[in-house]
């Protein structure tokens, strides 16, 4: 079955060529709050486990499950919410994911034992995963082609705030007389607040004109934000599995799906393993480090290296292009991870270690962590856009699951060299996937992207 024919490129020419408006900034902020919680939780769960292990006598299996269960659930959430948003519309589903996320965070904070915590983190993960395809696609479908990359990447860049607030709040709480039991519960519960804060605003957002047009609505939806608020579900009834079939039946679309999903899987393997296991990595520097000292060190790394990487990615996304940034990022990740793996006793060289480790964060953010989020919001036809993004995000979370679950075992097997060596290898693979399977999308409308020149792999399978 061939992919759906693209709409005329003139249908949305006015909105495609428009500048950035207040409406765009509002949508960006509303869409980004879920990613604050995503990154916040990604960091603080490492701190939480450091606090819980001596109190609950947590073994390696339980530790791995606590840190990785939310990632498996996020894969399910991305698939589910992504498909439903293509079936019923972005508006109908938007906001439900943050309620699920908040419920999971609050319930996790009330957990009486490790197994309840694992179960509630599964609920949290469903909400986190559901946010990926819907938020990215809403921002992409509203943005003009000249600024789309920046706006979508800025939605994702809200992670930077979560990565900074997480260790900052943890450090503040660790200086108080509160018990560790109270501290970890407060840390987890706090993640629900940003998500709940944008629930009402998400429910008020109007349906994207591109979805209305593709769903063959009777109203004119060519870029008019004010009128793009209603659509009749009865006019669009499709099978849940229809979108998946449309993605895999067209060879060109399938190659792009494999490229986007493969690159995201490889990136998240390295990224999540490194970030969630950061207390283990920093312990390699000094066995005497307290939880507070390691938390402050991680905060410094995020502020100095990760946050500028997010910012630079957003500012250059529409200038350098997605493909250039992703190839550069994967390449430099391979170099930095490789240095950490190959330099003898690198963990004993405090400042060189921190600089190299920090640069790995910088080029992850100014690299595939941003672009793997942007790509799937652009390269698929509108009727399967959130479905495609959901599949790619799910593969990313699956890669994160593998990284989180295996990273501690790499560390215990052969120390830092094994863990960082594995991250370097998958970074090289990610570079190859990007170079041969993904197109450049900068400066093109979403409708044009269905007709742009093929990649080498797309030509080979045509």
Regions found by a protein language model. Give the residues of each.
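Transmembrane-helix signature of 12-pass secondary carriers
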Residues: 1-462
């Amino acid at each position: 079955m061939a992919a759906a024919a693209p709409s005329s490129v003139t249908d949305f020419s006015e909105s495609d060529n428009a500048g950035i408006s207040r409406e765009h900034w509002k949508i960006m902020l509303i869409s980004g709050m879920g990613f604050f919680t995503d990154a916040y939780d990604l960091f603080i769960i490492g701190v939480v486990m450091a606090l819980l292990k001596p109190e609950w006598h947590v073994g390696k299996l339980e530790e791995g499950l606590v840190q990785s269960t939310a990632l498996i659930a996020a894969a399910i959430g991305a698939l589910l919410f992504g498909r439903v948003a293509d079936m019923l519309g972005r508006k109908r589903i938007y906001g439900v994911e943050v309620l699920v996320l908040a419920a999971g965070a609050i319930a996790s904070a009330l957990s009486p034992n490790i197994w309840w915590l694992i179960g509630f983190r599964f609920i949290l993960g469903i909400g986190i995963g559901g946010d990926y395809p819907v938020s990215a696609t809403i921002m992409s479908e509203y943005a003009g082609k000249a600024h789309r990359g920046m706006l979508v990447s800025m939605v994702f860049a809200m992670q930077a705030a979560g990565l900074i607030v997480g260790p900052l709040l943890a450090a503040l709480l660790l200086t108080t007389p509160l018990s560790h039991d109270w501290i970890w519960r407060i840390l987890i519960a706090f993640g629900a607040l940003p998500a709940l804060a944008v629930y009402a605003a998400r429910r008020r957002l109007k349906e994207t004109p591109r979805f209305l047009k593709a769903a063959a609505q009777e109203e004119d939806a060519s870029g008019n934000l004010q009128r793009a608020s209603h659509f009749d579900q009865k006019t669009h009834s499709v099978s849940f599995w229809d979108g998946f079939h449309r993605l895999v039946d067209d060879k060109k679309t399938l190659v792009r799906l494999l490229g986007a999903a493969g690159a995201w899987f490889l990136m998240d393997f390295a990224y999540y393993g490194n970030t969630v296991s950061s207390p283990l990595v920093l312990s390699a520097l000094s066995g005497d480090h307290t939880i507070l000292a390691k938390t402050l060190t991680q905060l410094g790394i995020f502020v100095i290296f990760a946050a500028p990487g997010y910012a630079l990615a957003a500012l250059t996304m529409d200038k350098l292009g997605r493909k250039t940034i992703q190839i550069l990022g994967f390449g430099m990740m391979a170099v930095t991870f490789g240095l950490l793996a190959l330099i003898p006793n690198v963990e004993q060289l405090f400042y060189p270690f921190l600089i190299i480790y920090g640069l790995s964060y910088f080029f992850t953010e100014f690299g595939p962590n941003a672009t793997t989020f942007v790509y799937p919001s652009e390269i698929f036809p509108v009727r399967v856009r959130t479905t495609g993004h959901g599949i790619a995000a799910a593969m990313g979370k699956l890669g994160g699951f593998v990284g989180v679950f295996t990273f501690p075992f790499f560390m215990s097997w052969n120390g830092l060299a094994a863990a960082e060596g594995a991250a370097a290898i998958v970074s090289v693979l990610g570079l190859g996937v990007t170079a041969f399977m993904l197109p450049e999308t900068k400066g093109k409308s979403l409708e044009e992207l269905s007709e742009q020149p093929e990649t080498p792999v797309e030509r080979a399978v045509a």
